[in-house]
Every structure is written in structure tokens, then in C-alpha cells.
């Protein structure tokens, strides 16, 4: 059995490195689209809750079970479920909610792996989308940079990678301290605080020049840690939970799945630009609205491997999905549990 702490540590490293890409210039470029994406994702979160509650009532299920099958397991994912399931079970005095909700979240993760990237391929072919950032890490430019350097490339690249890992350790240590001292009672994931610390560190470095963050080394490490996380999290999936789900719960899930796909295809894509970046954000948004943000990033990565990198699309999904939505979704769930 894989240690869940190892999975969480790898994911924290990956997200901290993604946040280190967040230079002020890149943040300014994606600010408006990030706010739009955040607003639309919140609308989808409310829609998921209403669908779960309505369907649960129609099928004779407990209304809080409907909420668990909606926003908590879909947009919230396993991290949010871990925080809120004990409260729901205590509130309603019923057991089995945790197993059902985790089963729905697991089924969502599996389905998101199957539908997100194919939807992206469909949009690319239908609208002949081109990636404007394809030359962002141009090989010819990299070769010229290597030729001009007076040190062997492997030596320079290794040193830069070690520097980035050290910066990540410092950011994670600071985030742990902040979480313990000031945010102990706040139900937000640890990685959210890590990402905020990394964003501050990157822009502090750009402003003061005290240290640098090498883009190529950062890209190399993010790819390595994303692959590691996908491998570990896939091996850790408890697929047996899916087979324990009752027919009404599966019916509610597939209703949620259809709504999520339609929302990503027609709302995210059409309102966020109808371009390559908009397609990437729609793919990431669909995947993280079905159980786990990392699924969205892995589906985006599979498309970027084929069509070229797009850093601002990745950064928008990371900042919105893992920082802004982690906070606003917690508040939304608390509000929904209060009124229903």
C-alpha cells in the first residue's frame, strides 16, 4: 500500500514549482481570464450542488448525500471530502457517507482521465486551434544558449535544478509555519499556502535580483514531479469503492458528468477565448471539476506534449483551481451545509 503522505509531498512539490512560474508579467497577462474562470467555476460549483440535491430528493436519498455527490466530491475532490465528511456524518448521524462520497470522487477522477483530453483534441481539430506559445521553449534557442555558455550544460542545468528544489523546501517550510501559527482552524489545503509562498518568492526574486529561477530547469522538474504524482496517485486509486456505489448514486454521478462536459465545452471554451489557451483551460476545468485538479494538469500536459507548451494556461488553472477555488469552495460548502 502506498503511503498517502508521499503522494501529498510529491503533489506539494509539483504545485510549488508551478507557482514559481508565476512572474508578475505572466500574472498580469492572465489576470482577467483568471477572474472570469474563477467566477464560472463558482457558478459550476453551485450548479453541481443544486443538481446533487435535486436528484437526491427525486431518488429518495438524504439531501446531504446529494450535496456530497455534488460540489463536495466533484469540485471539492478528495482533499475537501477529507475535511468535511466527519462534519456531515456527525450532523446527520448516518454512516457510509465517506465511502459513497470517496467512491463518487474516484469515479470522477477515472472518467475525467477518459473525457478531458479527447474533448481538447476535438476542439483543436474542429476550430483548427494553433498554440501561440509553441516556440516558448524553442530548441534552436536552447542550443544557442548552450553554445554560448562557458560551462557544460549538464553542470549548469543540475545546479539550477538543485536551486529550485531548495527554494521549494524553503517555501514549503514557511507555508507549514504560517498554516500552524495563523491558519490552523481554516479548512484550506496545505498546498494552497505553499503556492502563495512560491508566488511571493518568485516575484521577490524578480524584483530584487537576489536569486534567479531558471525557466528550463523549472519546466524539467515540473514535468518529472507531475509524472511521479500521476504514477503514485493512479496506483493509490481505490477502484473497489466504485463497485460499492448503488445505482441511484451512479445515476446522479452520470448526470453531473454530462453537465460538467457541456459546461466545459460551451461555457468555459466559448467565454474564455475560443483559442488554444481557452481550450486548455476548459480541459483543465473539466478535469478538476470532477475530483482532482492534478487530473486537469495531467490532461493539459498530454496535449502540450503534442502541440507545445502553454505556461499561462497552466498557471491560470493552477492559481484558480488550487488557490482561489480552494478558498471559495470551502466557504460555499460551509454555506450550503448551513442552509440545507
Q: What does each of the following model-derived ranges do?
A:
Residues 4-13, 22-54, 165, 220, ...:
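Entry/N-cap segments of selected transmembrane alpha helices
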Residues 1-8, 96-104, 180-191, 213-219, ...:
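Interfacial loop-to-helix junctions that mark the boundaries of transmembrane helices
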Residues 109-117, 121-207:
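Membrane-embedded hairpin module used as a gating/binding unit in multi-pass transport
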Residues 167-268:
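Transmembrane helical segments that form the transport core of multi-pass membrane transport proteins
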Amino acid at each position: 500500500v502506498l503511503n498517502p503522505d508521499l503522494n501529498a509531498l510529491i503533489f506539494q512539490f509539483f504545485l510549488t514549482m508551478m507557482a514559481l512560474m508565476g512572474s508578475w508579467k505572466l500574472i498580469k497577462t492572465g489576470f482577467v481570464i483568471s477572474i472570469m474562470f474563477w467566477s464560472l467555476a463558482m457558478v459550476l460549483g453551485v450548479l453541481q450542488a443544486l443538481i446533487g440535491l435535486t436528484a437526491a430528493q427525486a431518488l429518495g436519498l438524504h439531501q446531504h448525500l446529494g450535496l456530497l455527490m455534488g460540489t463536495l466530491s466533484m469540485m471539492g475532490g478528495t482533499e475537501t471530502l477529507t475535511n468535511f465528511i466527519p462534519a456531515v456524518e456527525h450532523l446527520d448521524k448516518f454512516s457510509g457517507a465517506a465511502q459513497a462520497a470517496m467512491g463518487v470522487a474516484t469515479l470522477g477522477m477515472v472518467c475525467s482521465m477518459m473525457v478531458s483530453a479527447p474533448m481538447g483534441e476535438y476542439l483543436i481539430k474542429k476550430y483548427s486551434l494553433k498554440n501561440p506559445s509553441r516556440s516558448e521553449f524553442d530548441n534552436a534557442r536552447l542550443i544557442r544558449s548552450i553554445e554560448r555558455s562557458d560551462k557544460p550544460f549538464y553542470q549548469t542545468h543540475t545546479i539550477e535544478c538543485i536551486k529550485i528544489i531548495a527554494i521549494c523546501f524553503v517555501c514549503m517550510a514557511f507555508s507549514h509555519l504560517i498554516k500552524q501559527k495563523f491558519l490552523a482552524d481554516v479548512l484550506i489545503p496545505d498546498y494552497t499556502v505553499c503556492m502563495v509562498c512560491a508566488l511571493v518568492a518568485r516575484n521577490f526574486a524578480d524584483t530584487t535580483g537576489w536569486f534567479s529561477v531558471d525557466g528550463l530547469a523549472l519546466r524539467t522538474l515540473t514535468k518529472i514531479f507531475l509524472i511521479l504524482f500521476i504514477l503514485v496517485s493512479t496506483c493509490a486509486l481505490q477502484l473497489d469503492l466504485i463497485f460499492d456505489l448503488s445505482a441511484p448514486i451512479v445515476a446522479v454521478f452520470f448526470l453531473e458528468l454530462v453537465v460538467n462536459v457541456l459546461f466545459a465545452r460551451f461555457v468555459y471554451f466559448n467565454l474564455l477565448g475560443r483559442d488554444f489557451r481557452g481550450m486548455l483551460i476548459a480541459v483543465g476545468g473539466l478535469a478538476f471539476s470532477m475530483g482532482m485538479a492534478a487530473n486537469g494538469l495531467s490532461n493539459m500536459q498530454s496535449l502540450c506534449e503534442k502541440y507545445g507548451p502553454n505556461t499561462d494556461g497552466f498557471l491560470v488553472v493552477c492559481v484558480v483551481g488550487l488557490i482561489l477555488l480552494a478558498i471559495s469552495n470551502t466557504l460555499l460548502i460551509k454555506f450550503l451545509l448551513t442552509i440545507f
